[in-house]
């Protein structure tokens, strides 16, 4: 009995904190690894993000969503809210007929206008067939944001209770243009903080 009391005295607080952390991870937070280039340049392949669960979903949040027809979580940006009409015309976003800026796209849109991202897709991380494929997609596109048929002008009406999610690298992202809108229950949390790699640690 004394041995058990001594154990609790020495390790009880540590075990309590460990238990609380484990419970908080189940209910309040998680982490996710970015896979692929769909969120370039905001988030890079292999980065690890801290995700907070049960937050209200707001426009332009970066969220983690679960694909119903797949078995993986994806990281995308919220563009369309329930009931919205989303329209793109030659890289301009209109939300319910109001033109809306997307400053997080400015860098890649400039690169697209400069050389259709050929230099970007020839750099580190785009070696081999992947780079060749990405360059061919970019060459074919007449705008940075196009639909699945490469139309530069297109629109979506977001159903009530659902959200339109797009990647920041519109040319290579598989998102709501391909799989449709996402129900609220399929959005598992909001990415709030990048903690890996150390050189890129911080908010975004």
Swiss-Prot record:
Keywords: Cell membrane, Hydrolase, Membrane, Protease, Transmembrane, Transmembrane helix. It is found in: Cell membrane. Gene3D superfamilies: Umud Fragment, subunit A. CDD domains: Peptidase_S24_S26. Its EC number is 3.4.21.89. It is a single-pass type II membrane protein. GO terms for biological process: signal peptide processing. Residues 31-204 are extracellular. The chain crosses the membrane at residues 11-30. It catalyses: Cleavage of hydrophobic, N-terminal signal or leader sequences from secreted and periplasmic proteins. The active site is at 38, 76. Its main location: membrane. It comes from the Bacteria. One of its GO terms (molecular function) is serine-type endopeptidase activity. It is an enzyme of class 3 (hydrolase). GO terms for cellular component: plasma membrane. Residues 1-10 are cytoplasmic. PANTHER family: CHLOROPLAST PROCESSING PEPTIDASE (PTHR43390:SF1), SIGNAL PEPTIDASE I (PTHR43390). Belongs to the peptidase S26 family. This is Signal peptidase I. It comes from Streptococcus pneumoniae (strain ATCC BAA-255 / R6). The gene is lepB.
